[in-house]
Amino acid sequence: MLIIWKLNKTKKEPLYQQLLHQIISSIQQGELLPGQRLPAERKLAEALQINRSTVVHALEELMSLGWIERRQGSGTHVAQGQWGNRQPAIYQWRTLFSSPLLKEDPYITQLKNQNDAKNGLDLYTGDLSSDLIPDFEFPAMTWDKIMHEEKQLTPTGYKPLKKLIFQHFFQDIPQKGQDILITAGSTQGIFWLIQVLLKPGDTIATEDPSFLFSLPLFAARGIHLKGIKQDQAGIDCQALEELIQKKKIKLLYLNPNYQNPTGKTMSLKRRKEIIRVCQKHHLPIIEDDVFSELGFGQSLPSLKSLAPDQVIYLGSLSKIFSSSIKVGWLVAPNPLIKSLVSAKKITENETDLLPQLLATAALSQQTYKKQQQQLAKKLQDRSQAFAQTLQAFKEDWQFSPIDGGLYYWLTWRQKKLTRNDWQVFLQEGLFIAPSFLFSNDTSSMRINYTPVDKKKRMIFSQKLASITEKLKNGR
């Protein structure tokens, strides 16, 4: 391969660190692909005019951090593992904060820079389209009223909200031995669970693909992620059991309803099989159910309802309220909730009262259930119309119907795409989430269909048709 790195011997940063960071940057930008072979140590040292020992030092660090791997008799290759398994190069504080790993994926940076384009169509977003958000009525609140309600704010959250959450969402779960911790959305819940339950070097198993691989939380803490392949019913239970036996897995994270990013719903049979495996191996489950209020029909039993003591449950209303009002909850056995509260106190990180008051007001309304059902019907209608639009592209893009949530998952049927091929989406102003943000796969994409109303369906169709032709013709 052509050696593209250049080192500056006048910089204070050691040469091996310069080489390490440049190789990481090349991997992130798609210049080096998973499985691609790196030049031999001697050849690399000669090309860069540095000592071979400097090259060896950089490569050993990269291997320990999960970015490359050595294969007996076949040299050094870029690791096949997902982004979430790769850790930052921690040498000194100044190099930690400049580490390429802690920066967002270059594709996301490009997308953000273009997202304000007049002719762009943003289907990358993780939010419900603003025209679909229910019009909840919130009572006027004086400052005295807010200060009065603050008296009901406990270390685990606002008491009236906790009571309403149990009434609305957990009627089928025994409350004895369980408690609720109010959070600023499910991602904060994940963050606190990492702090309390895991230490650097621990491993979490999850679906492949999964939005967990797009979060920097794990790499920053030195936590490893292992993906388990899915079929239409959910993760492969045999693969899960083999992974548990092979690796010391501390937690299993699942998004069983309208999974992010694939939109799949795990079958009831598969839910029970997974619980059986996890109970056999005493493996706790984190159930992220943030899309539960966005289902089109009757929902399946949650993992939490099937195994209350085995499952830590994450819920949220942020998907209905919009991302500007972040409020969620974590339901778990009492001892874990107490540990999470202690961790929050140490860092003085409390959940704001105002979003909790708004959530309480919404759930208290007699019309809440009716509005939620109306939203579900609007989503179903928009989803069906979007699926009909996709029919024109079924020879080139594979997709499956969904039962709820925000996302469709499209997979390219032709020759395998590379990271660079996705630049055409940015050029055409169709903003989506490529699969390499969630997995090693580079030939699929996540689309948020909810902004695609009747007018935007035509725009979407035109843009996707143009992109499809360019991809088929090699751009």
Identify the meaning behind each predicted range.
Residues 126-143, 152-164:
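A structural motif shared across PLP-dependent enzymes of the aminotransferase-like
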Residues 71-74, 293, 305-339:
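Active-site PLP attachment segment
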Residues 28, 64, 171, 245, ...:
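The C-terminal cap of the DNA-recognition helix in HTH/winged-HTH DNA-binding domains
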Residues 340-347, 363-387:
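Structural signature of PLP-dependent enzymes
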Residues 376-387, 397-411:
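Conserved glycine-rich beta-strand-loop-beta hairpin in the small C-terminal domain of fold type I
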Residues 427-448:
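Conserved PLP cofactor-binding pocket of PLP-dependent enzymes
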Residues 149-281, 293-294, 298-306, 462:
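Conserved core of the PLP fold type I
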Residues 1-140, 345-351, 412, 423, ...:
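N-terminal basic, amphipathic alpha-helical segments
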